[in-house]
Amino acid sequence: MLVEAERQTPELVRASYEQTYCEMRLAGYTAVGEFHYLGVPEALAARDAASAAGIELVLLHVAYARGGLPRFRQDSVAAYLEEVEALSSAGLRVGVAPHSVRACPAEWLQEIGRYASDHALPLHVHADEQPREIEECLAEHGCRPIELLARTGCLGAHTVVVHATHADGAELDLLAAAGATICACPTTEADLGDGFLPAERVRTRGIPLCVGSDSNMRIDPLEELRELEGIARRQTGRRGVFSTGELLSFGSAQGARAIGLESWPDIAIDLDHRSLAGVESDCVAAALVAGCGADVVTG
């Protein structure tokens, strides 16, 4: 993957965005928070591809101080924030995204957190995705990742913690107190073998949830929602941990809120699709979440 990332040109990136956003729109995605690791030409390609596909795009520009590929990194947090300004000036809707506590030192997190708050921008960050990340954070900072985000001013109602797979109770309490959102990415977490979101503990604390794909391995928002409920059922030993309405909100209202949108385009469902044959009108939503794939989406 890293070798492929190194050889990407704006033209190749544009082709990838066009393919991916087309697939996403056909599957029922209408808005995307794009973790963007590259420069302005590639960002403009993302904007154009999203517009052509009918996708509302929020570009979450990634901050990388260490690790990753050289082309992902910025020389300083000031240089990173200048890139964010340039993207905004180019007409893109933007958010900030310190990649992780591994990739960004505490000083960067403080500056990015302050900038996000001052400019009312969404702040997305990977945290508690893998045990090794937690071990490294404890060794460097003496605290766990979400605790570090709180210490550096990165936790607030505008914050979205991606994954939170291994968050402990104290960290979940911090998220709840801050009004921060968790973005679960069930199919990617399964693909990488990262573990399971502590869904029941998240639910009981009232922490807002949304879902993301986090990769193009599977592009199916209904599958993400179904897998999230499946995880919760396996953890608790009971059905219906999240209601149908809650699950659909994770993929719509709460997802839009997580990327700073107040509204989002609707989708159309083929009610004559074989997956919905015989389903009464008041059960369509439940049938969508429990048993349908992206092929029921018609527009």
Short names for language-model regions:
Residues 100, 158-167, 184-190, 212:
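Catalytic beta/alpha-barrel core
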Residues 123-130, 193-195, 200-224, 261-268:
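Short acidic/histidine-rich active-site segments
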Residues 41-165:
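Metal-coordinating catalytic core of metallo-dependent amide/deamination hydrolases
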Residues 1-56, 79-89:
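Alpha-helical scaffold segments that flank or form the walls of functional sites
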Residues 54-56, 115-122, 154-157, 174-183, ...:
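Glycine-enriched alpha-helix->loop->beta-strand junction motifs that scaffold or abut catalytic
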Residues 28, 50, 96, 126, ...:
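Divalent metal-coordination and catalytic microenvironments
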Residues 250-267, 298-299:
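Mid-to-C-terminal alpha-helical segments outside catalytic/metal-binding sites
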Residues 265-299:
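C-terminal cap of metal-dependent C-N hydrolases
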